[in-house]
Design a protein with these regions (language model features):
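Short secondary-structure transition hinges
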Residues: 6-8, 50-54
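A short coil-to-beta-strand element that immediately follows conserved catalytic motifs
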Residues: 30-40, 76-77
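Catalytic core of Fe(II)/2-oxoglutarate
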Residues: 42, 47-48, 55-60, 68-153
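Non-heme Fe(II)/2-oxoglutarate
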Residues: 1-28
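Short, conserved, surface-exposed binding loops centered on an aromatic residue
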Residues: 14, 27-33, 53-58, 72
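Conserved short hydrophobic patches within well-ordered secondary structure
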Residues: 12-13, 62-67
């Protein structure tokens, strides 16, 4: 448990590590994930965005975004979109309800995603979590992640 986080967050964090959750995630996605790799709080505000990009870390990586932004209006930019290639004009899905929702994408060579430029005075609150295949012998199925030397929550 992390003393910097409240009891609700610690309960949520513990659940994300549970066999119950991991088995449900594997069953739902069909992706052989074994454990959580990263857990990050993310806050985007007016002027925030993320250019479209592709990680392609490996075939056993899921990226999950949980959103906690009340009153997000349909069509407003800021949710993590999914695109057919690393080009904002190729968006195929963009969440519009960011109040207690989630987006799951399987990482790979065609999993382009990003967030359009936020023009309103709003805050997009989210948690970004990577789940990935892991072995004691070989480590993470997708290798080390960018920022591995930095502390993660």
């Amino acid at each position: 448990l992390d003393p910097k986080l409240g009891p609700e967050w610690n309960k949520f964090f513990k659940f994300l590590h549970s066999d119950e959750f991991l088995n449900a995630l594997k069953k739902f996605s069909g992706v052989a994930v074994d454990k959580m790799k990263t857990f990050r709080f993310v806050l985007y505000q007016k002027g925030g965005f993320q250019l479209p990009h592709i990680h392609n870390d490996g075939p056993s990586t899921l990226i999950v975004f949980f959103y906690f932004s009340k009153g997000w209006e349909k069509g407003d930019p800021g949710g993590t979109y999914v695109a057919s290639e690393a080009d904002e004009s190729k968006i195929i899905f963009e969440p519009y309800n960011l109040d207690n929702t989630m987006v799951i994408l399987q990482d790979g060579p065609y999993s382009a995603h990003g967030a359009r430029y936020i023009v309103k005075d709003v805050k997009r609150k989210a948690i970004q979590i990577y789940f990935e295949g892991y072995s004691e012998e070989t480590g993470w199925s997708g290798g080390e992640y960018e920022g591995a030397d930095k502390p993660q929550v």
